[in-house]
Structures are given as C-alpha cells and as structure tokens.
C-alpha cells in the first residue's frame, strides 16, 4: 500500500510517496517517489491545461542528421567551398539541408521552407525564412564546381569507409538515367539530351547518372553525371581513371578490390584500360555474340553449392575475349529460366491473338465492300509491328499473299523448332568473364556478379517518389544539375548507412519501411502558463507515442539525445 510521507530538509518539509510490502514476513519500503514541496505539489495539481501544443517531425530528420554528423558533412563541404563573410549559413549547411530534405520528404526548393518549419531541423539547423528561398539555395549551389564536388565526395566516402568500417573487396559500377522537364530550346544545359529513357518518356531530355557502390550496405562511394544520349561504353571510358583514383584513395589494398560492371560497358579499349588498372573485374558478355558458349547444355555443367546458389549450374572455360584470354563462366539458373519462359509464352500468345484477329479480318474482306481496301504493303507493315519485340520474328513465319481479286490474305505459322532451340540455348543462361583465375571459384564469380542488385536497388530508391527521389529537379543548367545529383547521392549514402546500422543491430528494414517508421516519431512541445512568482512559461517536450519497433529503432540510434530539454 502507498502512503504519503513528510521529510524535513534544512527545516523545510518535502513529501514522498512510499510503497511498503512485507518481505520475508517483515515490512519493507519497495518504492519511493519524490513529490516535492507542498507548493510544487499544489502548482502541479492546479496547473491549467497547456496553452499551446506544437508538433514537429522528429525521427526521420534526426536519424539522418546523426549520420550526417558522423560523416562531418558541413565541415567537409566548407573546407572545399569556404564561407563568404561571417554572416548567414554556409554552403555546407545549405547542401546538408538539401540532402536531408531528400532523405525525409523530397520537395522543390520553393517548398523546402514549409517542410523545414514542420521538422525538428528548424531547431538543429536554425535558419530564417529569408535564408530558405529558392534564390538563396541557387546562389550557394552556384559556388560549387565539378572539381569541388569530386573532392568533397571523395573525402565523405573516405570518412564513411573508416568510421563505418565498410568492406571494399567487391565494388559495383552501373548507370541509369532520369528524365527532366528542360525545354527543348534550353541551350544552356548540355547534359540533358534525348535518348533511351529507362523509365519511359523518350520524348523528354535525359540526365545520365553512374554510381560506384559497395556490396556492404549499398553505400555509394562515387557518382558521375553524363549526357543522357551517351552510350554506357563511352561513359565508362571517360570515367575509368576516376574510378581507379577513387579506389586508390579509399583503400591501401586496391589490388584486392574486384570491380563488377555490366555488358553495356564492354569494348576492347575499355577492357584494355581495366587491364592496365589496379583492380580485378567481373563482367558479362552479350549472348548473341557467343553462340558457341550458349550451345553448352546444362548436362555439361557443374551444379554449384546449393546453400549459396540453389538451382544454378556453371561451365567454366577460357576464351579470348576483347583481345585477351579470360576465365569464362556459362551459367544456367533454373529460376531465371522459369521466369523467362513464362514471359516468352505470354508474349507469344499475345502475338498469336493479334495475328489471328488480323487474319480473320482480312478473310472477311470482299471486293464489293465499301471503303478503302487493305493493301499488301499495309498488311506487311501491320505484321511487322505485331512481331516487334525480342525473338518474335524468329518464332513466327508470316506471309502476305494477294488473291485473284487483288485482296491481301495472311498466312502465319508458329515455329516450334525455333522455340525449342531458344529454350535449349539462350533461356536461363548468362555468360560471365573475369581476370580472376584459379584463385576464384565458380561460386565466387557468380556471387560477385549477382551483387549488382545492390547498385540496382540504389537506382530504384532514387526513382521512388517517397524518399530519396531524384525528382523534382527544377534546375536548368549543367552546373546546378551536377550539384543536385551530388546531394541526392549524398542522401542515398546517409540513408543506406542508417539502414546498415540498424541491420547490424538485428533490425532489417528497407529504406521505405525504415523511414515510414522514423517519420511517424514526432517531437511534441506543450507550453503552459508561467507559474506563480515566475515570468517564464513552462515548456514540456516529449516524443509522441511509439510502437515497439519504433522504440527499438530509437534506442539503437540514440535519438533521445536530440530531444529538446
């Protein structure tokens, strides 16, 4: 039972709530709660309701901010782009805020002020409304050159490697592009060009982005922006020296690093450059250029370790590739085969239905019918359009003939022999090549190439509108597009390091799941009237109610240290 107890301290009474229980037959005080003086108890009991309650987003902002603190983002940027004068925010503060906005709630520069006011960053990075205009951001972005971006990123990457202990034994290089809304007549920007858009929108100008990332946490260590109409192999040739320099700057054992890249980067010149560099490599080859290798059947292959690579077989050999003898691995993946067969069958059935519909329509056409009659040329163009797509022209034989009345008729046949040939040669197979010899097993080669999914996941994150989104860009010059790309990749580094930190503590979440949980944690501030004999109002700050997962995440990240006292 609890009871109220008075205790005199220096002649003044103070009150405690004490709970007493019998322990081994004897009364014992098991809990004591200090209540204070009679005046303070009265004040709390009679305190009016809060005059003002405010709430700011807390979890996502401070979690990303804590990683940025560890990376020393502001100081690093400011070392390379010194502040002008002594007043106002530095370039480092502007770029950090832009990156944190990308982490938490991607928006345009004109909307960043409204987001900022609702975030706890308004307390951690205090700025005025006048300092958060689009023009102030653009003015500070204007000061950052391409060389400075590269130097800043290299220093941040080195900090990430050393302070977070990133593994560098296998690094991944890949490229993608993003569509922009730059006007066709904007001649100031040369980077955005029309090309093959990986998100569709071929009518829009594209900006290319290449990234070097770790397999350990998908952390980007370098990026490169390039013209949207530039082929990957041309881009790779222009950036390979930077790749080598970045790896040398990050590791003293650069000869132990294996670089993984896709077949789009292949060329004899590029492979010569890689051969002359310090890195090992694993890449892939275009299947249609090596039909002798694709003819190898699964029965000739060795089944790989089932615990690491279930349902994967491989045939290892040597072949002269791009002018040099290389270790070559032909792999067969049963899961890939099943998926490709399912997709191919769907496309085949779609073409069959279209050809049958066209055939039936032509069959019902009569000389006496009114209107414009179909022509052989027109039908052939229609058939050609129907059979667009990979393998379709090989799988169907189609012939347009003319009747005695001059009307076109369609005859077509599905080529079962070509279908079986396709299944036995191309489907489910991949050709890998590497400069590694007997020092690497088949399993190591396959697992290294498969690790490409890490950098592909990074690109998906940059194209997700919820967090990290590369869009909206709303920049119209190459220089500002480069700076925009820099802080987007910086945001990607921050959130991937954050996700990796949680995973190391047993909390495995995607970026979206992680940020959904974190951004629901709010800082709630309650403002009470000033008590008697005081002019200052009472301010109480606490976090909003958290679920079990949020409590665990907040504990691992130590978020309570950012709570306003």
Residue ranges with predicted function:
Residues 1-93:
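Conserved glycine(s) in the ABC-transporter nucleotide-binding domain "signature"
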């Amino acid at each position: 039972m609890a009871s109220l107890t008075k205790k005199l301290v220096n002649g003044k009474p103070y009150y405690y709530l004490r709970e007493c229980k019998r322990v081994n037959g004897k009364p014992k005080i098991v809990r004591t709660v200090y209540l204070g003086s009679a005046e303070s108890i009265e004040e709390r009991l009679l305190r009016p309701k809060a005059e003002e309650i405010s709430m700011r987003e807390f979890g996502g902002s401070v979690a990303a901010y804590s990683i940025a603190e560890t990376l020393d983002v502001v100081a690093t940027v400011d070392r390379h782009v010194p502040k002008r004068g002594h007043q106002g925010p530095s370039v480092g503060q502007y770029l950090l805020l832009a990156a944190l906005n990308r982490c938490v709630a991607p928006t345009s520069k004109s909307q960043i002020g409204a987001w900022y006011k609702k975030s706890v960053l308004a307390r951690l990075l205090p700025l005025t409304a006048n300092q958060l205009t689009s023009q102030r951001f653009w003015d500070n972005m204007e000061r950052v050159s391409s060389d400075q971006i590269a130097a800043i990123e290299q220093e941040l990457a080195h900090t990430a490697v050393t302070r977070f202990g990133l593994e560098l034994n296998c690094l991944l290089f890949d490229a993608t592009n993003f569509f922009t809304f730059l006007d066709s007549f904007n001649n100031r920007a040369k980077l955005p060009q029309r090309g093959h858009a990986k998100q569709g929108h071929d009518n829009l100008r594209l900006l290319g982005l290449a990234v070097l990332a770790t397999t350990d946490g998908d952390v980007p260590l370098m990026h490169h922006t390039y013209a949207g109409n530039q082929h990957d192999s041309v881009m790779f040739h222009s950036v390979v020296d930077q790749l080598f320099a970045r790896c040398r700057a990050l590791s003293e054992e650069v000869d132990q690093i294996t670089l993984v890249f896709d077949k789009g980067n292949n060329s004899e010149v590029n492979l010569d450059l890689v051969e002359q560099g310090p890195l090992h490599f694993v890449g892939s080859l275009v299947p249609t250029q090596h039909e002798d290798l694709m003819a190898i059947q699964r029965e000739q292959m060795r089944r790989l370790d089932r615990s690491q690579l279930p349902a994967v077989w491989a045939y290892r050999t040597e072949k002269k590739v791009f002018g040099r003898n290389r270790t070559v691995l032909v792999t067969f993946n049963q899961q890939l085969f099943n998926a490709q067969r399912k997709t191919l069958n769907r496309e085949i059935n779609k073409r069959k239905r279209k050809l049958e519909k066209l055939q039936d329509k032509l069959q019902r056409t009569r000389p006496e019918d009114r209107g414009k009659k179909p022509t052989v040329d027109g039908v052939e163009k229609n058939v050609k359009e129907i059979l667009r797509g990979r393998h379709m022209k090989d799988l169907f034989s189609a012939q347009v003939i003319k009747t005695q009345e001059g009307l076109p008729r369609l005859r077509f046949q599905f080529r079962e022999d070509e279908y079986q040939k396709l299944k036995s040669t191309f489907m489910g197979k991949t050709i890998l090549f590497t400069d590694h010899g007997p020092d690497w097993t088949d399993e190591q080669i396959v697992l290294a190439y498969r690790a490409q999914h890490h950098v592909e996941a990074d690109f998906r994150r940059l194209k997700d509108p919820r967090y990290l989104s590369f869009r909206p860009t709303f920049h119209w010059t190459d220089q500002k597009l480069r700076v925009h790309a820099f802080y987007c990749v910086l945001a990607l580094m921050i959130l991937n390091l954050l996700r990796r930190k949680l995973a190391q503590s047993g909390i495995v979440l995607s970026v979206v799941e992680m940020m959904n949980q974190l951004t629901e944690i709010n800082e709630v501030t309650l403002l009470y009237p000033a008590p008697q004999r005081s002019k200052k109002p009472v301010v109480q700050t606490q976090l909003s109610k958290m679920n079990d997962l949020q409590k665990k995440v907040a504990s691992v990240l130590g978020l309570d240290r950012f709570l306003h006292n």
